[in-house]
């Protein structure tokens, strides 16, 4: 519902810098935090909300690739792991999810 306010402004919206920490190679039968499945499910949920709103014209997840940063209580080690790729540029499941999502032919077929 928070997105609905932005429709009243009558301007196109691009959502950026949204993501979920994921440790590459960690998998689960259910999408538990830090698994690659959780990251994909997180994006599916957020993007489902975006897809329902015609004024949303774009998206850019945070981040392209994992990167070093300071430690924090909600972070595994000293690395921001919200990347679609690892620091070595190995794709995570989310990279494949976005490849499929962004490969659709129609501009409004997100």
Language-model features: where?
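Substrate-binding clefts and catalytic carboxylate motifs of secreted carbohydrate-active enzymes
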Residues: 1-110
């Amino acid at each position: 519902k928070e997105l609905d306010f932005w429709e009243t402004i009558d301007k196109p919206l691009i959502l950026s810098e949204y993501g979920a920490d994921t440790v590459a190679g960690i998998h689960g039968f259910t999408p538990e935090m830090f698994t690659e499945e959780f990251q994909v499910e997180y994006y599916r949920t957020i993007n489902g909300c975006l897809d329902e709103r015609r004024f949303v014209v774009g998206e850019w997840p945070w981040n392209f690739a994992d990167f070093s940063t300071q430690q924090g209580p909600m972070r595994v080690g000293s690395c921001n792991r919200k990347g679609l790729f690892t620091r070595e540029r190995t794709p995570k499941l989310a990279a494949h999810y976005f490849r499929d999502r962004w490969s659709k032919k129609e501009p409004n077929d997100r």
